[in-house]
From Swiss-Prot:
It is found in: Cytoplasm. It comes from the Bacteria. Residues 4-184 form the Guanylate kinase-like domain. The gene is gmk. This is Guanylate kinase. The lineage of its organism: Bacteria, Pseudomonadati, Pseudomonadota, Gammaproteobacteria, Enterobacterales. InterPro entries: GK/Ca_channel_bsu, Guanylate_kin-like_dom, Guanylate_kinase, Guanylate_kinase_CS, P-loop_NTPase. GO terms for cellular component: cytosol. Its EC number is 2.7.4.8.
Amino acid sequence: MAKGLLFIVSAPSGTGKSSLIQALVNTHPLYSIKVSVSHTTRIIRPGECHGKHYYFISNTEFQNMIDKEEFLEYAKVFNNYYGTSKKQINYGLSTGTDVFLDIDWQGARQIRNKLPESKSIFILPPSKEELYRRLCKRGQDSDIIIKKRMNQAVSEMKHYIDYDYLIINDNFNLAVSDLYKIIRVAHLSIKHQIQRNNLLIRNLLNE
């Protein structure tokens, strides 16, 4: 069985990356896709579920996982830790499932260094004004936090150049389509096609 492909998706808070990934999973059943669930030390928000949105753990538990080298990557964001479990990623890929990682640029850099075959995607908002509007519309943060997120967004967006692909989330449906096309192209690479269709290719070339 051919291994699944690993896709890294990063974007500033409020850009819509989580909604894009979920829409991709719901509307494109051609490929088996799983969204990795990260571990975090931040407080659970209303409407979130442990094990679905994140694995919510204590600082002590997180540190124990670091000590045991159980994370593929981890980073501190807004005074909270976020990390990606090695075991979870390896299992998903081994079953032929494509795994999506919704992580920030720091985590993305760590994973690209460890797994250079991964595909990385950065998502930008159409403008700062639209990003601010989306953050306000969520109704989750105070004005002070929103201002902090906007400042952080500018810093994060400077790292788009480190990624393989860039999507502008101006038109949601078009952005979902662009995300799907990236998956399709990755599956058509020579390396992946040889893994998936090795027997077929050998039979065709057998004299």
